[in-house]
Structures are given as C-alpha cells and as structure tokens.
Amino acid sequence: MTERYAVFGNPIGHSKSPAIHSMFATETAQSLTYEAILAPIDAFEATFKEFVTNKGYGANVTVPFKEQAFALCDELSEQAKLAGAVNTLSVLADGKIRGDNTDGLGLVADLQRNLGSLTGLKVLLVGAGGAARGSVLPLLQAGIAKLSIVNRTQAKAEILAELFSSYGDVVSLPISHTGKSYDVIINSTSSSLSGEVPNISSDSITSQTVCYDMMYGKEPTSFNVWAKAQGAKQTVDGLGMLVGQAAESFNIWRKVRPSVEPVLTQLRAEL
C-alpha cells in the first residue's frame, strides 16, 4: 500500500518539501505520496487529525505551526522537547503521535558536508528564535568547543544559553561585541529575506571563518554577501539545511537514509 505523507503550513504554496520527498522516494525505491496541505491559521490540529483519519502516516510542519504540533504530540524526542517545537510528526502503530525536530540535525549535516568535522570549533549563533533554539543541541552534540549566542534582544539569548548550559559551553553576548573571532558564524535570523544584515561586528570574521545563513535564494543572501566582503573563508546558504532536515524526517518515517547531494544539486539548478 502506498503510504501518505504531507507538509502543513500557512502559507505553503512555496514549499519544496513535496519535490524533495518525491526525489527521496524515487532514489530509495519507496512507495509513498507526499503533498502540501494549507492548514487554516486557527485549525491546524483539526486539519492534521483529518489527515491522520485519511491514512496519513507522517507529516512535516512549517511556519507557523511548529509549536502547535509540539502541543498535540503524545511522545516527544529529547531534541523536540528542548527545541520547544516539532517539524516532524509520526503516526505510531498504536495511533499515538510522536514529535521530532530535525531542523538542527539538517543544519549540522550540512555544516559537516561543507566543513568536515565540527569538533573543537568556536561557533557564533546569531538569533535566539525557534530556528536557533532547534540548532543548539545538535551543534553541541557534534562536538563544538564553544557556542556563543547573540540576539538583538540580549535577554532572549541569555534565556537560550541558560536552557542549554548543562549540555556544553554555551554563553550569551551583546550582539555588537568586539574582539572575538569565530570558526563558524551562523545567521539563524530571517534578516536576509529583507536584504538586511544582523548588527554583528566585522571583527568576528577572519580569513578562516565560515559563515552560514539559514536563508537561501538564487543569488547569495545579503548576510553572505556582507560576510564575503569582510573576508570570510567560505559562505554557505541554507538550502542544504532544508534538504538535510527532510532527509532526517524521511529516515524517521521510512528507516532508510536518502542521499542529499543529488537532490540538493537539482534544487540549486531550479532556483
């Protein structure tokens, strides 16, 4: 029987998830369907439950429903609990709903694909919203030496650093702090969508720094253009993170890990 999967969001028309999972299914010879479902802002839970009733096996969840998805789960992975949000829902054999968060795993996989091992690296995380929160534990588990978090509102960065303090060396700093350089700088904010750049000091970047923007587009993002102008060694956008988190979700559902590279190459060509 062909099993049914979907991505829920609002808006959702722009989603690349159906194309990604269709390519994964072809590559791994899995029989499934994957569609995009527009859920009303005030009716995510009802829309998802209708999907489950109609033989839905699993789903991805995007903006603005990740916290609502978290709330409806019967079981949660450790990563989902700490992220406070769910992007992957699985319908278990007993009908219970399990929630996972694969966003940070997708980020780490893409960083490792571009950099190799992350062990011992000093990382600056810009932003303290949901995307940042979902990334902290996977980064620490990948072996980074220290994670510094900055945010326009420093109190939010402080809360995040405190939440993960028992998992590794995590600190919060003023966004405009100077005198520190990093191996990797990750922009988790959506600043590039409006052509802006976070107010971080250019001396955070050296000729050995890799800068990563979670946003992506046909042209380099505004953050990556700025980082390159400051002399960054390498800039990477978030398209690989998108494909990586999808691969993690696919593996949770199908117990088979698809190859990211061919899908990423095709998506890049289609931007």
Curated annotation (Swiss-Prot):
Recorded catalytic activity of this chain's protein: shikimate + NADP(+) = 3-dehydroshikimate + NADPH + H(+)
Recorded superkingdom: Bacteria
Binding site for NADP(+): E78, G127, A128, G129, G130, A131, N151, R152, T153, Q154, A155, K156, M214, G238
Enzyme class at the top of the EC tree: oxidoreductase
InterPro entries named among the record's database cross-references: Aminoacid_DH-like_N_sf (IPR046346), NAD(P)-bd_dom_sf (IPR036291), SDH_C (IPR041121), Shikimate_DH (IPR011342), Shikimate_DH-bd_N (IPR013708), Shikimate_DH_fam (IPR022893), Shikm_DH/Glu-tRNA_Rdtase (IPR006151)
Pathway as given in its UniProt record: Metabolic intermediate biosynthesis; chorismate biosynthesis; chorismate from D-erythrose 4-phosphate and phosphoenolpyruvate: step 4/7
Keywords: Amino-acid biosynthesis, Aromatic amino acid biosynthesis, NADP, Oxidoreductase
Residues forming the catalytic site: K66 (proton acceptor)
UniProt cross-references to Gene3D superfamilies, sorted A to Z: Leucine Dehydrogenase, chain A, domain 1 (3.40.50.10860), NAD(P)-binding Rossmann-like Domain (3.40.50.720)
Residues bound to shikimate: S15, K16, S17, T62, N87, D103, Y216
GO aspect biological process, one term: shikimate metabolic process
Subunit structure: Homodimer.
Function: Involved in the biosynthesis of the chorismate, which leads to the biosynthesis of aromatic amino acids. Catalyzes the reversible NADPH linked reduction of 3-dehydroshikimate (DHSA) to yield shikimate (SA).
Family the entry assigns: Belongs to the shikimate dehydrogenase family.
Protein name: Shikimate dehydrogenase (NADP(+))
Species for this entry: Shewanella pealeana (strain ATCC 700345 / ANG-SQ1)
